[in-house]
């Protein structure tokens, strides 16, 4: 009888595969580029571990299916810290690649980063199994930060909370089948109204997942990590690949706990006494009486020592009193007791060290990054000297970690490579030149970091204000450095780096952004197209190329690039919205609305399609619908540009014109590319007879959207009013190129030409 259900399941599986249903679960997929086969990331790999709406992907890469004879291939496994968040192009793998290439010329070192944001060891194990098939010479493993918050973690905001490994692997095996994927999709649909995230919300998604030091789910997560790590190392052993396994360093000194909870079972009297002592300690610490504060905190610890904030405050006091060894221990305990566990703790690093020891005879080599970064830190306690925030390394930190890896790798390289040893490792400064770390890039990297630390869970840290000041100082320091390098010097750095690495996608991508920021549109487009050639599987490359083409007025070509992005990723909201904008400006209303609504379905929290839909509705006189769209956008961006744009339109409905202008000025200051706001501001300024200012806003609107006909019409009118007929004619003729049937433009041209004829 068992054969009947097996036959049914087998038939269903075959039918689904023949119908093309489901997705490939492998980490890599094969593509062909100019007659050569390459492997690139499979964008749907993480669907087994995340709801598709919040699935994570790795950084762009491609490597030859047939490894060249002079190549040394390294796979770097881990999470966002290994990847190099917030800017992977300056991650540890990139620095390592430069170090090896500079010291051992003639060898093509491939450091392939297969690290992915927000994953954990449950995801890294199948990645490792796929890497085992692709001729790796060495694996680097730098993982552990997400064991509590990643898929199947103890604090995850989606899925099961730290089930056993057998259950996890059974579920993942089921999802490898198309039948399992169908069942998973049906279950998600039935739970569509549940608390499962619809879009990725970063670290703030895990705010409600607090667990204690000895919580059973936490202990299961540790056991799972140990089992997964052992299996990863055994996978490498079977593939005959040596492994450099590293402990993980974290910010101890400048990152307070994200959440603190008391030891379960304390009585009301104990909690009351603890709070009284703790608050008195804070009063003394704030006043600079660190010895008195320290004594009070230690007294509180006699009642409950597991409150993470208490341990961190002990660390601050010991640090102030130069008790550096004890301060380090205090900060480590604060990290270990953190109830929102985004950092590798003592137990995770102990598991890593123990695994390296157990597998030492199977070519597993330990790098103790946690100790190395501590030893190179002031007072022996790592902080913002090496980190952007809690775990992500800055330029200096990534270089130091890469140098530590390189030293270990040096002893593992074959004689065919070490025979060309140049004798020294490249300096951080030289690595920076090879990676084109311009002052413009340094400032650019700090901006998303600063935005991150102004959001949950960082806002929940008790010392958030002080931490924010430190980060703000770092950002200002980066901005101040902008004066130390001219744009031409930065450009030369890019060009020199590209001359040595002409196929480096990251260099081309950053050079593209740099050229765009400098107003070199044609060259920026060339770089964007080169990026598409290097990583043809990446939809973002086509999208960015399309946005540049729009600004150059090459609308048909831009639409083609947006279409190619959508062909790769059917739910690419940004590209769908961009298609809607093009069609809207071509007055293809129904098609434009279709694309805007499709973008909203793909990402309900994406502001732009609501604004663009509202602007289209407003132009059609559908005021109520437009206001509803603007209000939705405003709700997604409170106190942001969308909010002020909504306020401007609400004020316009009440004829409060000064308020309209003030709000629109605020919008364009905060978001210069918000072309609809610029256009509306131009209209208001023209109505107030501020013609020159209006002309500026219409010109800026056209710079961002050269296909927006009303801006050309209004700019032409403003120019004609100022007695500039030739320039006005140029704008009206542009309108006719965009819309040959435009009667307003024809009438304006006739009027100006008649005037010029009578008044030559």
Regions found by a protein language model. Name each.
Residues 22-104, 376:
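Membrane/wall-proximal cationic-aromatic binding patches
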Residues 144-354, 372-384, 407, 411-495, ...:
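Serine-dependent acyl-ester chemistry module
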Residues 274, 308-309, 505-506, 539-540, ...:
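Helix-start (N-cap) detector for alpha-helical repeat units in TPR-like alpha-solenoids
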Residues 286, 320, 517, 551-552, ...:
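Register position in tetratricopeptide repeats
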Residues 303, 337, 500, 533-534, ...:
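Structural marker of alpha-solenoid helical repeat scaffolds
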């Amino acid at each position: 009888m068992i054969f009947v259900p097996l036959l049914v399941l087998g038939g269903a599986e075959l039918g689904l595969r023949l119908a093309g249903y489901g997705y490939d679960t492998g980490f890599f997929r094969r593509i062909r580029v100019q007659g050569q086969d390459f492997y690139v990331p499979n964008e749907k790999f993480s669907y087994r571990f995340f709801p598709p709406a919040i699935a994570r992907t790795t950084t762009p890469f491609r490597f030859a299916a047939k490894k060249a004879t002079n190549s040394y291939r390294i796979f770097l496994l881990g999470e966002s810290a290994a990847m190099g968040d917030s800017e992977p192009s300056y991650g540890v793998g990139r620095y390592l690649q430069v170090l090896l290439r500079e010291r051992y010329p003639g060898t093509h070192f491939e450091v392939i980063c297969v690290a992915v944001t927000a994953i954990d060891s449950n995801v890294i194990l199948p990645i490792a199994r796929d890497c085992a098939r692709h001729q790796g010479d060495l694996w680097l493993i730098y993982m552990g930060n997400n064991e509590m918050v990643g898929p199947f973690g103890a604090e995850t905001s989606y899925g099961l909370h730290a089930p056993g490994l057998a259950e996890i692997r059974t579920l993942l095996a089921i999802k490898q089948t198309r039948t399992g994927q169908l069942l998973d999709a049906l279950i998600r649909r039935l739970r569509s109204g549940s608390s499962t995230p619809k879009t990725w919300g970063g670290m703030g998604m895990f705010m409600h997942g607090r667990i204690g030091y000895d919580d059973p789910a936490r202990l299961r997560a540790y056991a799972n990590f140990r089992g997964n790590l052992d299996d990863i190392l055994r996978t490498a052993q079977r593939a005959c690949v040596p492994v450099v396994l590293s402990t993980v360093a974290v910010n101890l000194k400048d990152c307070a706990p994200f959440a603190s909870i008391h030891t379960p079972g304390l009585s009301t009297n104990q909690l009351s006494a603890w709070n009284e002592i703790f608050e008195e300690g804070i009063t003394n610490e704030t006043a600079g009486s660190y010895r008195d504060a320290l004594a009070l905190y230690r007294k509180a610890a006699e009642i409950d020592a597991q409150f993470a904030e208490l341990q961190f405050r002990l660390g601050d006091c010991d640090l102030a009193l130069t008790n550096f060894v004890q301060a380090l221990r205090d900060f480590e305990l604060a990290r270990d007791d953190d109830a929102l566990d985004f950092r590798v703790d003592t137990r995770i690093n102990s598991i890593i060290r123990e695994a390296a020891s157990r597998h030492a005879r199977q070519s597993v080599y330990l790098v103790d990054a946690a100790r190395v970064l501590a030893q190179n830190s002031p007072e022996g306690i790592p902080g913002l000297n090496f980190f952007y925030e809690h775990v992500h390394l800055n330029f200096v930190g990534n270089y130091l970690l890469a140098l530590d890896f390189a030293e270990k790798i040096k002893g593992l390289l074959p004689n065919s490579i070490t025979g060309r040893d140049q004798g020294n490792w490249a300096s951080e400064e030289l690595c920076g030149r090879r990676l084109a770390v311009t002052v413009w890039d340094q400032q650019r990297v700090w901006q998303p970091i600063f935005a991150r630390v102004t959001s949950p869970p960082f806002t929940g840290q008790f010392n958030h204000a002080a931490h924010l000041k430190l980060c703000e100082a770092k950002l200002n320091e980066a901005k101040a450095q902008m004066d130390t390098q001219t744009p031409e010097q930065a450009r030369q750095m890019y060009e020199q780096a590209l001359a040595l690495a002409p196929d480096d996608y990251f260099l081309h991508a950053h050079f593209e952004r740099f050229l765009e920021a400098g107003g070199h549109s044609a060259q920026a487009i060339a770089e964007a197209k080169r990026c598409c050639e290097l990583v043809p599987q990446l939809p973002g490359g086509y999208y960015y190329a399309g946005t540049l083409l729009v600004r150059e007025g090459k609308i048909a070509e831009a639409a083609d690039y947006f279409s190619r992005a959508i062909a790769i990723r059917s739910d690419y909201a940004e590209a769908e919205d961009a298609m809607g904008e093009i069609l809207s400006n071509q007055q293809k209303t129904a098609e434009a609305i279709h694309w805007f609504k499709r973008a909203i379905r793909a990402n309900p929290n994406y502001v732009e399609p609501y604004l663009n839909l509202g602007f289209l509705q407003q132009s059609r006189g559908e005021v109520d619908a437009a206001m509803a769209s603007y209000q939705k956008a405003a709700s997604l961006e409170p106190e942001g540009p969308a909010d002020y744009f909504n306020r401007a339109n609400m004020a316009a409905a009440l004829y409060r014109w000064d308020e309209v202008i003030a709000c629109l000025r605020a919008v364009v200051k905060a978001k210069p590319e918000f072309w609809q706001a610029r256009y509306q501001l131009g209209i208001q300024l023209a109505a107030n007879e501020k013609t020159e200012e209006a002309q500026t806003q219409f010109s800026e609107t056209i710079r961002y959207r050269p296909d927006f006909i009303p801006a050309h019409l209004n700019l032409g009118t403003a120019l004609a009013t100022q007695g500039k007929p030739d320039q006005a004619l140029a704008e009206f003729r542009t309108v006719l190129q965009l819309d040959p049937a435009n009667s307003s433009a024809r009438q304006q041209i006739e009027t100006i030409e008649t005037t010029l004829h009578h008044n030559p």
